[in-house]
């Protein structure tokens, strides 16, 4: 699940 979040640009921006 975390991997998918990293792939998403929106979530990646949150990191």
UniProtKB/Swiss-Prot annotation:
Main localization category: secreted
Origin: domain of life: Eukaryota
Annotated transmembrane regions: none
Cellular compartments annotated: Secreted
Keywords: Neurotoxin, Secreted, Toxin
GO MF assignments: toxin activity
Tissue specificity statement from the Swiss-Prot or TrEMBL entry: Expressed by the venom gland.
Name recorded for this polypeptide: Scolopendra 10564.33 Da toxin
Protein's organism: Scolopendra viridicornis nigra (Brazilian giant centipede)
């Amino acid at each position: 699940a975390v991997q998918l979040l990293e792939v998403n640009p929106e979530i990646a921006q949150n990191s």
